[in-house]
């Protein structure tokens, strides 16, 4: 951006034609309007650096829930003690959510303090729907809360680092930068400027030429207000300073080149002639850049002394026969950089850059705030998720192969209405007082309903009778049970986890592990679906 503007300025220096006629009314009006546009920047609102309070509040609520779900012993470690200075580094142990003590100590202590009111943790638990949970259930919720709390802590750290690293991008600092460019360091309005501020940094001269420039010396003026004075203020030799080169209503300046004692007050009066602005929106960086370019594009070329305004000869004394202007000197090597590095231009460009950076930071802060709020919402919505997981566990428990098959067999037994057919189908006949008999599943004769094709294995098509492997005390007879089976049903082996006499070799059911793995796979799949 800066390079493009500088290139445009240099091009104008080389190409703009100079007119050495005496200054007349209205000659500098276009520059006056441009300078007024720049001065209006000082009245505009400036955007603020985005706050982090929404994200910090969300994190605080997450920690309050964490503390509320912890046991009393843990809460006591962080509870505020009346009349004693709390040491934030002496807590031992670890929270139920297994967060790092050194990094979270302050947050836990603050959470305990926030929960120290008359109602304690009841409002927090009520908000999460966890008022009546057991201690075991609290541990379950804390386990689920842990990754959320860790993620929130990491985001909060990002948020704080970003905000503290952008402390210089406040609206106050940006406004001060703009005001420095317009009126001088420390001045907040045209009428607050001083003569020394108007004369320019380090200027010990006492004439208008010293401020505005002359044939052999570049201008010392370094604020927009000083440029306004140089380009618009009249001179005593021209109708008592009443020449109106900028505005038909501008005040007269009946002062000679050597008298600048009240130049700063006259400059403020000229600023009062500027048009007002009804724009209430925050100032944008592009507006600053545009206002700068609008003025700097009007630089005129002269013989190694480019200038703004009206010039005839000698220098910018204010006389219509000499110059009402701001002049630079480009005779010696390196002097041309002054044209590209006008102090107030550089300062305003810096203010524009600060606004751009602030807007970028604000977008990131808003995003992190929203992330923390989303995590807070998730933390306080754990109950329905964990209840769903419990239901899935219960469903899986019911779906365990042995139990499921027993229920299926019970359904088959119900179809038999006679004591003569019931026992033949691995069922048993039950009667109450010798009457009202019914056919029910015989637990000692568990059968499984399979999808085997007709004729496969033993028994009827699609049905397999599960042998009583434990009844065999001989390895050979044990393994004979597998004859004709596509999958071994018995095996001479030591016990697995969950089986009795694990160290003893005996004939055992070969489907034990398959059933356990099936049940675990259902639970695992259900929990994975719950999380993702």
Swiss-Prot record:
GO terms for cellular component: plasma membrane; side of membrane. VSG forms a coat on the surface of the parasite. The trypanosome evades the immune response of the host by expressing a series of antigenically distinct VSGs from an estimated 1000 VSG genes. Glycans are attached at residues 66, 419, 509. Residues 1-23 form the signal peptide. It is a lipid-anchor; GPI-anchor. A lipid is attached at residue 509 (GPI-anchor amidated asparagine). Residues 510-532 form a propeptide. It is found in: Cell membrane. The keyword Cell membrane applies. Its main location: membrane. Residues 79-107, 408-504 are annotated as: Disordered. Pfam families: Trypan_glycop_C, VSG_B. Residues 427-445, 472-484, 494-504 have a biased composition (Basic and acidic residues). Keywords: Cell membrane, Glycoprotein, GPI-anchor, Lipoprotein, Membrane, Signal, Trypanosomiasis. This is Variant surface glycoprotein ILTAT 1.23. Residues 450-470 have a biased composition (Low complexity).
